[in-house]
Amino acid sequence: MSLLSRLAETTDDRPGAVRVGDRSLSWVELRRAATAVADDLRGAARVAVPATASLETVVGVVGGLLAGAAVVPVPPDAGPMERNHILRDSGAELLLAAPGTPDADAASPPVVPLDLARRSDRRHPEPDPAATALILYTSGTTGAPKGAVLSRHAIAACLDGLADAWAWTPDDVLAHGLPLFHVHGLVLGVLGPLRVGSRLRHVGRPHPERYAAAGASMYFGVPTIWSRIAAQPAAARALRGARLLVSGSAALPEPVFAALAGLTGHRPLERYGMTETLVTVSARADGVRRPGTVGVPLPGVRTRVVDEHGGPLPADAMGELQVRGGTLFDGYLNRPDADAATRTADGWFRTGDVATVDPDGAHRIVGRAATDLIKSGGYRIGAGEVEDALLAHPGVREAAVVGTPHPDLGQQVTAYVVGDGVAEAELIDFVARHLSAHKRPRQVRLVGALPRNAMGKVQKSRLTEA
């Protein structure tokens, strides 16, 4: 089966199948425009695409996939150093560029212009499922971004698993305003509709009023988006006609979950994944959705929770989540050392995330092992639990909890809070009344904003560097 099976097979020429902002293409127009791009690639093995939120990005990515090239999305906000690293490290042979794209510099490969007015009906052979589809660059805490190599098979396995879990069909209309250089926005949010056959409405910047006006059956968002929608009741109520509200890329705070459920009539559906693994765990459309849980493994995916020595842990015990299955990446490009560090001797991928699994199989992500598992005075404290307790205070708008050095305890619980008229001592006492005493923050720092990346994830390393 073709990776973009519905797009490859359709004869549907009705307007508006794929809409980005106020511009759209029918299925047939998209296929013919992307095929014209594929014709221009002349057998290039790797092609870079400036991944703006635009129809040009959709056509460029699809054109590269039709041609059998590995597509390298370049974040539009990447600085010169990051951009040059991605282009050099990926070995991109061509750069697809839309009108208005900044002029290429010495580090750029030859430019192929993207012209959405061109059409072609040529048929390109379907590449081997094991062939690379995407090279997505992901940043760690140190060093330059690493290119995660994702095969066509892995993407297909992920999307088919999600179609099963979410009852995702051609009758759906998907709306979101996510960046198109990450798994969430590009793989799930663009390639998903092209494989399933559902219509796509990318709203541009993810403002609540744009989500409210989209009239979709499915919505994708990160917690920051959902928090802003929940803060605008009229926008949230406009989503009552939807079928699924999907949240990912970070944990959805329980107060936001509750607010959305009350305003929209829908309990949000959470899922879990990484660039390296794609989505591996998700709540199901026909299953129970509980705040703080991300569901069960997708078909073909296995998970386990292990201790610091790699030993298996029982249900409800907190440890590192490891996964295996058909959605996993092929490795880091040019970095066998980094790739080897993520694999166990028996073939499991080390996510670096701390999790628990309930007796019924529901997964709960506590956070990153490096930043969200706090070891204080012999206790293991999950940062997310303390964050949820802080967010239950009416004066707290945002909260991030980290472990910081303590001369006696090893680490202490330190909270960074964005709030209105709250005091440090008040918040410490509030948490102590709701959680075990050892989980209360020893220090609360009131800040104007929390540092976030393009996907809305709090960058905790920047908090502790400040």
List PLM regions with ranges.
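Conserved AMP-binding/adenylation subdomain of ANL enzymes
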Residues: 156-173, 181-218, 232-233
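Conserved beta-loop-beta connector loops within the AMP-binding
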Residues: 290-291, 304-322, 341, 359-360, ...
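Gly/Ser/Thr-rich phosphate-binding loop
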Residues: 216-221, 230-290, 302
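Conserved ATP/PPi-binding loop(s) of AMP-dependent carboxylate-activating enzymes
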Residues: 296-300, 311-342, 362, 381
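Conserved AMP-binding A3 loop
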Residues: 26-28, 133-160
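Conserved pre-ATP/AMP-binding loop-to-beta segment of ANL
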Residues: 14, 120-137, 144, 167-173
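Conserved AMP-binding/adenylate-forming
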Residues: 23, 38-81, 380
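AMP-binding/adenylate-forming catalytic core of the ANL superfamily
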Residues: 325, 330-331, 354-439, 449, ...
